């Protein structure tokens, strides 16, 4: 399968202001990804996955204190690509090496909730097993 690359030009987690730009959205915390293919707006489930959301937002804003020195003070996701694209299933990003094995230099535990992957636009952490979350995420297509 031909790999499609979509550059993440800017990822900004919007705590406020998203409702001004997108009045159709329910009140909440959103991530706004600006890509070469257009805008992707994702709702972040802060109440159900507070550690995961705090990690994602702090990486996006360049304020994560746990990152490896090379990423310190930088908006981690800016300029990264979706390195894994599976048609009719999902896109995966958040890896600075674009290989599927890179990360921010630390790992954190899983948060299990009643959230499911039952439709398009679901955002989840991508990992290599229990307790291996870092920066990689995927977004479902269907």
Language model feature labels by segment:
Residues 13-142:
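Cyclophilin-like peptidyl-prolyl cis-trans isomerases
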């Amino acid at each position: 399968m031909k790999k499609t690359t979509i550059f993440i030009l800017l990822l900004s987690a919007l705590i406020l202001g998203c409702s001004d730009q997108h009045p159709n959205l329910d009140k909440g915390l959103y991530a706004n990804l600006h890509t070469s293919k257009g805008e992707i707006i994702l709702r972040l489930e802060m109440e159900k996955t507070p550690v995961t959301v705090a990690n994602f937002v702090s990486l996006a804003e360049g304020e994560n204190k746990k990152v490896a020195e090379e990423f310190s003070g930088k908006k981690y996701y800016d300029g990264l690509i979706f390195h894994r694209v599976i048609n009719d299933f999902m896109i995966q990003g958040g890896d600075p090496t674009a290989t599927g094995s890179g990360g921010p230099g630390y790992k954190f535990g899983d948060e299990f909730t009643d959230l499911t992957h039952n439709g398009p636009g679901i955002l989840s952490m991508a990992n290599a097993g229990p307790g291996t979350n870092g920066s990689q995420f995927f977004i479902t297509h269907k």
